[in-house]
Amino acid sequence: MPETEKIAEVFEELTGSKISKNFLDHRKIFLWGPVTDESSKDLVGKLLYLEMKDPGKKITFYINSPGGVVTSGMTVFDTIKMISSPVHTVCMGMAASMGSVLLAAGTKGERSIWPNGKVMIHQPSIGGQIVAPATDLKIHAEEILKTKTKLNQILADACGHPISKLEEDTDRDYYMDAEEAIKYGIVDKLATKIDFN
């Protein structure tokens, strides 16, 4: 590798990590991409670090995610709910599927969306190919239905709707623009500026 490429790589690594550290120092965390074991580990670590460093002080959580693994997302959700620091969630771009659940997990009154943000809610699905005996398939089906009910209840509570509305709305992909998401109750307000406080 030529020397200039090495220098550029080192500069990018140092700059990127310095920017990330500055955001963390200002209690800003990001989910940019799918909810995975790796991204949830990163988020939970940052949430717990910030809680330990200064309990009860605001954390801003920016979300641009197509969703992902439910169990990974629920780890982040539970952490948000168990720490004393209020978590202000912000949808920038898209908060879909598990991303929408994390958006809704923020402190009520402090969940916002950027003007061109989108939210999508739907029922959970089983990914990949399952090769199993019929009895095990039944177990998987029962588990996904329990998960569906749990997620619908979480969103119903967060949005102030009866669970029957969520069951109907999440039967298929349900998209909302910024104004629709506010009206639905999954966020509370439109973000009109970037808050560095």
Curated annotation (Swiss-Prot):
What EC number(s) does this enzyme carry? 3.4.21.92
Has the keyword Nucleus been applied to this entry? no
Which is a GO BP term held by this UniProt record? protein quality control for misfolded or incompletely synthesized proteins
Against InterPro entries, the record matches this protein to: ClpP, ClpP/crotonase-like_dom_sf, ClpP/TepA, ClpP_His_AS, ClpP_Ser_AS
Give the source's domain of life in one word. Bacteria
Query: What role is this protein assigned?
Result: Cleaves peptides in various proteins in a process that requires ATP hydrolysis. Has a chymotrypsin-like activity. Plays a major role in the degradation of misfolded proteins.
Name assigned to this protein: ATP-dependent Clp protease proteolytic subunit 2
Organism, by scientific name, is Leptospira interrogans serogroup Icterohaemorrhagiae serovar copenhageni (strain Fiocruz L1-130)
